Amino acid sequence: MAKTSRSVMIAKGLQRVLNVGLLLLAAILIVFLVKETIHLAKVLFVNNEESTSYLLIEGIVIYFLYFEFIALIVKYFESGYHFPLRYFIYIGITAIIRLIIVDHENPIDTLIYSAAILLLVVTLYLANTDRLKRE
């Protein structure tokens, strides 16, 4: 009985530490999200057309990455301390899209990144089927 009680206390203590850590991470991500918003506003008003469009698109994708991580943390607390797999897949797809936008000089690499996105989309489809869906 005492061993079970102690293990429950340890689990609850570790859960609190994890929750506090995630709240701190969410606060840091919100700060970066605000900084990225300011950066996007500055890039929007720069006159150099070609570099501005690349910087703007890259900034928007980074913005979505921050947004998705914050949404993942919110979903963690809403779903009873559980990270849904599909949010990690969304983040992976967005990160690879950002990589393609930033580094698109080698066609073979771009093809491999595209295949990785296709694999993640298939994984997302399978994870959302009724047999695997937890939510």
Swiss-Prot record:
Domain of life: Bacteria
Any Gene Ontology CC annotation: plasma membrane
Cellular location(s): Cell inner membrane
Pfam families: PsiE (PF06146)
Protein's recorded name: Protein PsiE homolog
Alphabetical keyword list: Cell inner membrane, Cell membrane, Membrane, Transmembrane, Transmembrane helix
Organism: Serratia proteamaculans (strain 568)
Keyword Electron transport recorded: no
Membrane topology note: Multi-pass membrane protein
InterPro entries: P_starv_induced_PsiE, P_starv_induced_PsiE-like
